[in-house]
Amino acid sequence: WQVVLDRYGLEKKSRIGYSIGAAYAPDWGEHTLSFRPNETVLVPENAVVHIILGMWMDGWGMELSETLHVTESGYTKMTDFPQHVHLVQP
């Protein structure tokens, strides 16, 4: 993620995903799995995670969001929403 942003002189300091589900009761600090630089927690099989690649800048923004079920061989998407770019003009 950051390697691509570096090409455009952008930086994302916040995480790009986190664990969700009944086993991860929410709180403001969460203190569970987060996808961020230097994260050391392994993602266990059967975990459910929300990946949110977003940038919100002055005058523009973008966001990609996907909920995934982690499997032994990779992941399964939890939604079937079409994956298209939706351009919204102000």
Label the predicted regions.
Residues 86-90:
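A short, polar/proline- and glycine-enriched secondary-structure boundary/capping micro-motif
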Residues 1-82:
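Active-site cofactor/co-catalyst pockets and adjacent glycine-rich loops in catalytic enzymes
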